[in-house]
């Protein structure tokens, strides 16, 4: 089993590159497909998961001569980078003979002039990454597919996409699919500071579906460190259900959405129940997310539409919500409800969630056997062990100024040091959820990537762990005593 990383971003063609054209110094390797190293005189800009890409080239033929006709596009996957950056480890993917050494690829018809490659992203969109999950040239049975997104520009989406591929390999199926922001491209807990999906103008529905087929493979799916900005476009022709967990079952096949920012979304008459996170699969998990400015509008159709907007909506069994921050849900017009957490399950787990300023209740009516620990609300609806109620957004967050929201905690916030310590995962029935076995950033990492567990922190409630904040709104006094 291997983890196969591929990059995703707009710098995916010779007219918009990560780097290049480049002059190679040498290449050494073997095998089918060819794998080896390519060395350059000066270090190219490259990332693991990018392509080494040759456009309109020739390559040595099987029986001598020069094939390709000057129209071959040859692709190698970058799998390693030397410490000095001068040498790339690559694997042949497509476009020539599978045994082709990149240093033998040429720009002329007699294969006498060494071609100059480019460094580009492997995929241009998240959708094409998803489609490629059944590519036998990239993956083998038991592999983990990790798509790493780059903020070359904002990703644009018209409707979203479903992640349900990875079970069609000729050798079998993937064990997991992780769609994440590359580590250097992560947001810092504030909108427009990292990888972002921006809804296309005129739309209010960007739905990312984490889906498990029957039989349930791949086993784990995750969506992490990505902002979804619905563009504050109140279009009454569509609705929004932003991240939907669908078709899961138990630990053996679960899905995770974590470290995301979702904001400025709207539900409307065409989707009367809209949610930032909709859990219709069992044992799925949302942790360390920030959600704010969600609204619903009946668009003039009256009480018969009853349009609702919810931040965290659980309709399966065993759903898990840990260390999420939710702020400001409201109804624009109509008779629907705006609720932070809505639950209709027989079993669910809610730990360390900070939910404030939801027009019709921060926490809705809980059904069945629901476990609640250390949750916080601005009204009186947070219940369960060590719940905190009646705390205003102004007392909790750095900024709630529209367009400049910073939902990190500030000194004096009641959420500071008031959370339940969840370690590096939550054990339920002998299985460990929200851990490194189900996602790339487990529950102990906050929205700023602080490792609460490794740092020995007393946990805060919500997505942000503020290590520089004082639990009371003043700094410790510094006293100097002088002995005369």
Predicted regions and their residues:
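Viral virion structural and adsorption modules
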Residues: 1-10, 470-484
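Small/polar beta-strand repeat architecture
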Residues: 2-48, 55-128
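N-terminal extracellular ligand-recognition/capping segment immediately after the signal peptide
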Residues: 141-175, 182-186
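C-terminal accessory segments
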Residues: 388-468
């Amino acid at each position: 089993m291997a983890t196969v990383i591929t990059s995703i971003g707009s710098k995916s063609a010779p007219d918009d590159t990560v780097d290049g054209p480049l002059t190679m110094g040498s290449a050494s390797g073997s095998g089918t497909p060819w794998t080896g190293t390519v060395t350059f005189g000066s270090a190219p800009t490259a990332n693991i998961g990018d392509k080494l890409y040759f456009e309109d080239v020739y390559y040595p033929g099987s029986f001598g001569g020069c094939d390709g006709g000057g129209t071959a596009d040859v692709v190698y996957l970058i799998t390693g980078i030397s410490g000095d950056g001068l040498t790339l480890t690559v694997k042949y993917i497509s476009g020539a003979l599978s045994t082709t050494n990149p240093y033998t690829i040429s720009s002329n018809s007699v294969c006498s002039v060494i071609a100059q490659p480019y460094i580009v992203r492997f995929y241009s969109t998240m959708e094409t990454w998803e489609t490629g999950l059944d590519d036998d040239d990239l993956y083998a049975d038991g592999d983990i597919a990790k798509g790493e997104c780059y903020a070359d520009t904002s990703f644009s989406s018209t409707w979203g996409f479903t992640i349900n591929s990875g079970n069609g390999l000729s050798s079998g199926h993937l064990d997991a699919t992780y769609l994440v922001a590359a580590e250097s491209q992560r947001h810092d807990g504030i909108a427009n500071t990292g990888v972002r999906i921006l809804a296309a103008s005129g739309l209010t529905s960007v739905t990312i579906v984490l889906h498990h087929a029957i039989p349930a493979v791949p086993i784990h799916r995750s969506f992490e460190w990505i902002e979804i900005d619905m563009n504050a476009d109140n279009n009454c022709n569509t609705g929004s259900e932003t991240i939907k967990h669908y078709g899961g079952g138990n630990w053996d096949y679960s899905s995770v959405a974590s470290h995301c920012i979702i904001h400025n979304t709207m539900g409307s008459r065409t989707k009367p129940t809209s949610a930032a996170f909709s859990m219709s699969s069992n044992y799925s998990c949302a942790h360390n997310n920030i959600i704010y400015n969600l609204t619903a509008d009946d668009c003039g159709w009256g009480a018969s539409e009853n349009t609702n907007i919810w931040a965290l909506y659980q309709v399966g069994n065993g759903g898990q919500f840990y260390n999420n921050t939710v702020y400001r849900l409201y109804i624009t017009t109509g008779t629907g409800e705006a609720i932070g957490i809505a639950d209709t399950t027989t079993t669910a787990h809610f730990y360390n969630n900070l939910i404030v300023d939801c027009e019709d209740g921060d926490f809705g009516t809980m059904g069945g056997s629901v476990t609640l620990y250390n949750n916080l609300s601005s009204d009186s609806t947070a219940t369960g062990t060590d719940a905190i109620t009646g705390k205003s957004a102004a007392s909790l967050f750095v900024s709630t100024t529209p367009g400049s929201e910073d939902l990190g905690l500030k000194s004096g916030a009641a959420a500071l040091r008031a959370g339940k310590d969840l370690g590096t995962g939550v054990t339920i029935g002998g299985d460990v959820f929200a851990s490194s076995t189900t996602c790339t950033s487990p529950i102990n990492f906050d929205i700023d990537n602080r490792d609460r567990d490794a740092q020995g922190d007393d946990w805060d409630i919500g997505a942000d762990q503020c290590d520089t904040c004082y639990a009371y709104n003043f700094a410790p006094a510094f006293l100097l005593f002088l002995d005369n």
